[in-house]
């Protein structure tokens, strides 16, 4: 195995380990919104993905329009509802989301041929307490950040079609 491939695999393994450490360092969930999102995903799991009754939003336009603002995110979270321990499901989902976010950021930096990409990501993680806190959340904004970094890399380095597809899923 050559040196570059070893560095790449080690970097990805480090991002995976960091993502799980961020989530499982504490037995608590970082943000109560994760409980809402995982429960909403559970409702889709139990009632089907086209379920559109939201009795908990009586005083919102969501009740009238029967639309879920985070529909794609809630579909993404359905597999994490197959665990008996809901907190574990939230934390596992958060670790996967943090890993995907950091991986997209890493890919964006590699696409732009930025040296020491893993070091820049580590600097980003510890740059402010709020960054680490947000990475610990089980919320859709983390994935949006990763997709935005990836879209920017395609914008700077060329690639209109990838930007189109990223925009469609983001």
Language-model features, listed with the residues they occupy:
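Helix-to-loop transition at the C-terminal end of transmembrane segments
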Residues: 21-35
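Membrane-interface transmembrane helices that cradle and orient dolichyl/undecaprenyl
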Residues: 148-163
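Short acidic/glycine- and proline-prone juxtamembrane loop motifs at membrane-interface regions
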Residues: 133-142
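Extracytosolic helix-loop segments that constitute the early lumenal/periplasmic catalytic or substrate-binding loops
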Residues: 42-64, 72
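Transmembrane-helix motifs of polytopic, lipid-linked glycan transferases
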Residues: 92-113
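Transmembrane and membrane-interface helices of multi-pass
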Residues: 119-129
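Short hydrophobic/aromatic helix or loop-helix immediately within or flanking a transmembrane segment
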Residues: 60-85
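Start-transfer (signal-anchor) and selected internal transmembrane alpha helices
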Residues: 1-24, 107-111
């Amino acid at each position: 195995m050559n040196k570059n491939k070893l560095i790449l695999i080690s970097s990805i393994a480090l991002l995976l380990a960091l993502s799980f450490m961020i989530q499982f360092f504490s037995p608590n969930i970082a943000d109560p919104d994760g409980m809402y999102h995982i429960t909403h995903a559970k409702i889709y799991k139990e009632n089907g993905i086209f379920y559109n009754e939201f009795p908990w939003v009586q005083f919102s336009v969501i009740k009238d329009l029967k639309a879920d603002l985070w529909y794609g995110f809630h579909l993404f979270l359905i597999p994490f509802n197959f665990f008996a321990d809901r907190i574990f499901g939230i934390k596992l989902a958060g670790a996967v989301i943090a890993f995907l976010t950091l991986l997209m950021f890493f890919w964006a930096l590699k696409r732009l041929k930025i040296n020491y990409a893993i070091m820049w990501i580590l600097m980003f993680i510890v740059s402010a307490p709020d960054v680490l806190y947000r990475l610990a959340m089980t919320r859709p904004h983390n994935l949006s950040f990763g997709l935005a970094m990836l879209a920017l890399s395609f914008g700077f380095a060329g690639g209109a079609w990838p930007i189109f597809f990223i925009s469609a899923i983001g």
